[in-house]
Swiss-Prot record:
Keyword hit for Oxidoreductase: yes
Taxonomy of the source species: Eukaryota, Fungi, Dikarya, Ascomycota, Pezizomycotina
Name listed for the protein in its UniProt record: Questin oxidase
UniProt record similarity statement: Belongs to the questin oxidase family.
Pfam families (alphabetical): Questin_oxidase
Enzyme's top EC category: oxidoreductase
């Protein structure tokens, strides 16, 4: 049985699995590699946007049916850039049980080993559902900040925490909580709380059925938002922090506040959210250029799988589930603006002709072997999960809110594989689809 410090995977875990069985030795290999990562590696290998993806890569490769060799490849592709986890400060870790000390140490990457020890002990004592409830969903000042921090850093705390829950690994849950606690800020928290307040105090009544897709179009149509982030800001973090939330927070908040979720519509709105995220990833292209997947829109899809995992937990209340969907969608809108709010063209998905013609099953087999740091495997698995949960809503009432339907899910997955497999990491993705210079090395079509 897994503990707060020991990895012990069981068969048949995972939301979107390629198979119920893995080759002999796969679970043992995954246990060993994940334990090594947990014991030896920091959660951050650099000070900005340097997230440790080793657990993501190993677990997603396992879920796609990977064997021991595939899992070792998944580990090795991410391990060489990792840095050792520093020694923890015993007094600092002990002090985190005091809310003032917890608050004072939040937002500092150097505090990761202390938060990891703290959450490990908490989970050992009470189990991870109780700890996640207290530190993310209880409504205290600390929990409210932790809830918002799940969406920091391109959703990485949410992705990591949800992987721990999905595969029932308390130690990975502890890693995810520690990551959320110490993550540096892009000002996501004030945006989310400000937008929440705005949604509840606007003079005009909010339509709980406002399609999320219409809000992406509203972002595209807003000249202030289209100009707020620019390539000179540097990386995606700066385009969010200094661009969209620094120069156009009021404009993005007014649009984002219009997305609301009724507790009776959780499944529908969650499916709508992941359909729109997949639409961003597949349709944010450049006319005249070969198809590529925007790195930031990719994360909107992979984080959706993490959200699905949380929505399946009976210990998360319907009200908190509605809030998770609202906040995830609102942050998706921010990242769309930060990538330049490129025109979204459905035909770029529908007209795409895959080079390899892979089915889902053959795609899983191919992705397991691709040298990658986990992004491709996460993306493919999240798309398959999206296809499954969206299918009941793609026809009939409000079907127009679901831009991705039927074979389009597989088409986007094929596009991702075709455009990234065998390429160095900097050439696998587009790092902001709305900025023309980023397409300079992409072949013309």
């Amino acid at each position: 049985m897994a503990t707060a410090s020991q990895i012990r995977l069981r068969p048949r875990l995972g939301v979107a699995r390629a198979t119920d069985t893995n080759p002999d030795g796969a679970l043992e290999a995954a246990n060993r590699l994940l334990q090594k990562n947990h014991n030896e590696h920091h959660m951050f290998w650099r000070s900005v946007a340097g997230h440790n993806h080793v657990a993501h890569s190993v677990l997603n490769t396992l879920a796609l049916g990977g064997g021991p060799g595939d899992l070792q490849r998944a580990f090795d592709d991410g391990a060489e850039i990792q840095v050792p986890i520093p020694p923890m400060d015993r007094d600092a870790a002990a002090s985190l049980s005091t809310p003032d000390q917890f608050r004072a140490r939040m937002g500092s990457l150097e505090q990761y080993p202390n938060f990891l020890v703290f959450f490990t002990k908490e989970i050992e004592t009470r189990g991870y559902p109780a700890v996640v409830i207290e530190y993310c969903f209880s409504g205290t000042s600390i929990a409210e900040s932790m809830f918002a921090n799940l969406f920091e850093g391109l959703y990485h705390p949410l992705i990591h925490l949800a992987l721990g829950i999905e595969f029932d690994q308390p130690s990975i849950v502890a890693e995810g909580l520690a990551q959320a606690a110490c993550h540096d800020s892009m000002n996501i928290e004030p945006f989310l709380f400000g937008t929440d307040k705005l949604a509840k105090t606007q003079d005009a009544p909010i339509d709980l059925n406002t399609p999320l897709l219409s809000l992406f179009h509203a972002v595209r149509d807003n000249e202030v938002l289209r100009a707020a982030a620019h390539r000179d800001h540097g990386d995606g973090v700066a385009r969010v922090r200094d661009g969209i939330l620094g120069r156009a927070r009021e404009e993005i908040s007014l649009i984002a506040a219009r997305f609301r979720v009724d507790v009776d519509e959780l499944d529908h709105r969650a499916a709508e959210m992941i359909s729109c995220a997949a639409y961003l990833a597949g349709s944010a292209q450049r006319p005249g250029k070969a198809r590529k997947i925007d790195f930031f829109h990719l994360h909107a899809v992979t984080a959706s799988l993490g959200l699905i995992v949380l929505l399946q937990q009976p210990w998360v209340t319907p009200e908190q589930k509605a809030r998770l969907i609202e906040w995830k969608a609102r942050v998706d809108l921010v990242w769309y603006a930060a990538s330049g709010a490129v025109e979204l063209r459905r035909k770029d998905i529908v007209d795409y002709r895959p080079r390899h013609g892979l089915t889902w099953d053959s795609l899983y087999q191919a992705v397991r072997r691709v040298h990658d740091d986990g992004h491709l495997a996460k993306f493919i698995r999240a798309l398959k999960a999206g296809e499954q949960i969206s299918r009941p809503f793609e026809q009939g009432k409000r079907a127009e809110a679901f831009p991705i339907k039927g074979s389009m899910w597989l088409r986007i997955a094929q596009m991702a594989y075709d455009s990234s497999a065998g390429r160095p990491i900097e050439e696998k993705w587009i790092w902001g689809a709305g900025f023309e210079p980023n397409w300079a090395t992409v072949p013309a079509v």
